[in-house]
């Protein structure tokens, strides 16, 4: 049986990619995705370059750190801060597309988790939820378009995670906004199969090169 290659995994984006809200580092996305890949036989080298509060416009510095490694597989989580700061969706999507294209040009495979549906966060007033939900959905659609155009893989998080988070407040941290450790487990469970598929595709291509 052919040994799977070592893979350099990087996490880019905002507080979701960083892990804000989790009680322990091993509960965050990076270690959870690393564990999923390791269980599949990969030797994973993890780097988390995500910055809490980052917008899509500020991804450039993180991308430069990733391409300097260079990264093999990048997971990008971005959009929540663009929505919170009322960045026009077209501008946020354009910046995400630019970041994705730069990572691809440097040889990395890219998985982008689209903006979450923030309307289900307990901190969001009920009266504002329809507007917030619509804004999140609009950004998610544009993100998917630009990521696919740039050669990345889209992981849609909006509707599926909204159902889980909207019915279980234990998935939120004490700030009622960021995920808890249990919340990150739900997100990682959605992302891990997609990340594994991309890693397997990369390994298959490398084995025939």
State the predicted function of each range.
Residues 57:
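Switch II of P-loop NTPase G domains
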Residues 60-209:
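Alpha-helical cap/lid subdomain in secreted, periplasmic
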């Amino acid at each position: 049986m052919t040994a799977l290659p070592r893979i350099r995994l990087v996490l880019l984006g905002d507080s979701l990619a960083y892990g804000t809200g989790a009680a322990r580092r091993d509960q965050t996305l990076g270690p959870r995705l690393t564990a999923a890949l390791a269980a599949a036989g990969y030797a994973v080298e993890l780097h988390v370059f995500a910055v809490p509060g980052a917008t899509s416009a500020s991804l450039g510095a993180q991308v430069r750190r990733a391409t300097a490694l260079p990264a093999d597989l990048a997971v990008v989580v971005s959009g929540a801060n663009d929505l919170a700061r009322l960045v026009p969706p077209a501008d946020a999507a354009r910046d995400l597309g630019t970041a994705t294209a730069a990572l691809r040009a440097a040889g990395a495979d890219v998985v982008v988790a689209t903006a979450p549906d923030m309307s289900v966060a307990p901190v969001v007033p009920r009266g504002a939820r329809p507007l917030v939900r619509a804004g999140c959905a609009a950004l998610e659609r544009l993100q998917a378009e630009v990521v696919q155009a740039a050669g990345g893989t889209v992981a849609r998080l909006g509707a599926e995670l909204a159902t889980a988070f909207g019915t279980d407040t234990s998935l939120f941290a004490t700030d009622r906004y960021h995920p808890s450790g249990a919340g990150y487990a739900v997100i990682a469970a959605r992302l891990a199969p997609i990340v594994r598929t991309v890693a397997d595709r990369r390994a298959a291509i490398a084995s025939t090169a």
